[in-house]
Amino acid sequence: MANKTFEELFTELQLKAAEGDPATSRTAELVDKGVHAIGKKVVEEAAEVWMAAEYEGKEAAAEEISQLLYHVQVMMVARGISLDDVYAHL
């Protein structure tokens, strides 16, 4: 799998949410299920990041962080929040 930047992933997720089939695209499926379902995944992934960071190695923690970032970006897409909207608060 090719590495993606945060911005490239966000653009890809926007496209999948807009054009993807919920039956074949996890992103489209999550957006279709709504903010509540996505929020549950964000909380789950955040807990997994914590556990991996505390009890596992760097690679496991990095993988869990990537999954958390994915779900946070799906939430952003579902709510119509742009990267610039978030960057304004950094």
From Swiss-Prot:
One of its GO terms (cellular component) is cytoplasm. GO terms for biological process: L-histidine biosynthetic process. The keyword 4Fe-4S does not apply. Gene3D superfamilies: MazG-like. Its main location: cytoplasm. CDD domains: NTP-PPase_HisE (cd11547). The keyword Repressor does not apply. One of its GO terms (molecular function) is ATP binding. Keywords: Amino-acid biosynthesis, ATP-binding, Cytoplasm, Histidine biosynthesis, Hydrolase, Nucleotide-binding. Its EC number is 3.6.1.31. It is found in: Cytoplasm. Pfam families: PRA-PH. It catalyses: 1-(5-phospho-beta-D-ribosyl)-ATP + H2O = 1-(5-phospho-beta-D-ribosyl)-5'-AMP + diphosphate + H(+). InterPro entries: HisE, PRib-ATP_PPHydrolase-like. Pathway: Amino-acid biosynthesis; L-histidine biosynthesis; L-histidine from 5-phospho-alpha-D-ribose 1-diphosphate: step 2/9. Belongs to the PRA-PH family. HAMAP family: HisE. This is Phosphoribosyl-ATP pyrophosphatase. It comes from Streptomyces griseus subsp. griseus (strain JCM 4626 / CBS 651.72 / NBRC 13350 / KCC S-0626 / ISP 5235). The gene is hisE.
